[in-house]
Amino acid sequence: MIQIENTPNPNSLKFISENKISSVGVQEYQKTNVEQIDNYFIKTLLNLDGVELILVSENFLSVKKKEDSKWDNLKPSIISYLNDY
């Protein structure tokens, strides 16, 4: 089960998982550095059209989208990837 919370930034959402996502603390990943990322899961999310940045913690992801992208287009893919992870 994935819960979604709004953040103060309308271009960012917090996706909370019941499962552990990361065991290395908080990490930030930007689309501009996607080629340098070894984590396939993070790389896949960053390659979604409209995703700019991902902040990963133990049980949640905070995803920042481009201003002109729509959450209705991104949320289903993000949730699907999290459920499969």
Q: PLM features: what roles do these ranges have?
A:
Residues 3, 8, 80-85:
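Flexible metal-binding regulatory segments at protein termini and peripheral loops
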Residues 13, 59-65:
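A generic structural motif
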Residues 7-32:
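Short glycine-/aliphatic-rich beta-strand segments at the starts of folded cytosolic domains
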